[in-house]
């Protein structure tokens, strides 16, 4: 679905990091309480101090999360929550979805999404933008995710931060 969405040539404002998002301001990052490797988070915060890299701007949903996908009989049939559309780096959308997959399931599922997306789209996602989206996870994440899942599946709240941490560590390795 993300590859198709990003192929649409629809008008939208350009995405402005630190302005068009609810992520903490650059100077407001904090290591989540459940982090097992605070140094990983701090390294990612340091990467965010660099200006964002230029990337091809595509149409973005900007809130591409599993909880915003409509399903019927095991297939995605639609997408909700269109109030944040922009044009920008495709890794923003993929990274938001990766963050939820890591928090809810596993960092391996999160990485598999990135790999499949790159394979299908024929592009490499910029790790800076991936980190930007992954770092939307903070201490309020478990509350929001648990509420959005609303009993549809078990939620392992204590393990969320450490699973997202592994996804962040993987993105840092890709960055070099």
Regions found by a protein language model. Give the residues of each.
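Hydrophobic core positions within the conserved protein kinase catalytic domain
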Residues: 2-5, 48-49, 98
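Signature tryptophan residues that serve as conserved aromatic anchors
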Residues: 41, 71, 82, 128-129
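N-proximal accessory regions
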Residues: 59, 132-176
């Amino acid at each position: 679905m993300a590859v198709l969405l990003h192929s649409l040539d629809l008008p939208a404002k350009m995405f402005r990091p630190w302005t068009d998002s609810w992520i903490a301001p650059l100077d407001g990052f904090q290591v989540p309480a459940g982090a097992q490797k605070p140094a990983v988070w701090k390294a990612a915060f340091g990467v965010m101090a660099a200006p964002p890299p230029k990337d091809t701007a595509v149409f973005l949903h900007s809130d591409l999360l599993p909880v915003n996908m409509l399903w019927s009989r095991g297939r995605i049939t639609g997408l909700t929550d269109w109030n944040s559309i922009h044009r920008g780096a495709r890794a923003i959308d993929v990274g938001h979805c990766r963050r939820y997959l890591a928090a809810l399931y596993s960092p391996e599922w999160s990485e598999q999404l990135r790999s499949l997306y790159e394979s299908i789209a024929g592009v490499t996602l910029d790790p800076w933008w991936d980190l930007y989206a992954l770092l939307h996870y903070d201490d309020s994440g478990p509350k929001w995710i648990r509420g959005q899942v609303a009993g549809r599946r078990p939620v392992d709240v204590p393990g969320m931060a450490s699973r997202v941490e592994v996804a962040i560590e993987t993105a840092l390795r890709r960055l070099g």
